[in-house]
């Protein structure tokens, strides 16, 4: 209630949340934790009472996403407004993290090169499967060149197969084998 905030001499809490839509009409917010939260523990913090996104979308700057925010707090009866900048790795909104296997549903490829956005301290290998879950010859986990590192655009390759062009328009599944890592995104690109 605004009356409660006024009696406590604080600005009504407002935090930045993230939602998603696959069609632009129906929106979902799976995680109710704030994407950018107010700071209620530090006296006179720039974002102590109210936090809002300045723009509807982040700026893409190299491999990072920049989110400009406006923060507000009260000093006595005076409202102080400041600007903040939050940064996130590109496609870093969600990830699968840990050790194990991850398999997609059927996908249709239209490209030649396979890329991942991942941070892997162990190693990651990828294999391609047909609709019956059989490994496609030349694209097995054993033929995959292991990826290790932190890269938003790491190319995955298989020994003897530099291109996925032979798989164009086929329905396939991707299976990831991850040892101590985090995968944020993957995609197939023409170049």
Model-derived regions: residue spans:
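Carbohydrate-active catalytic/glycan-binding domains of CAZyme proteins
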Residues: 1-191
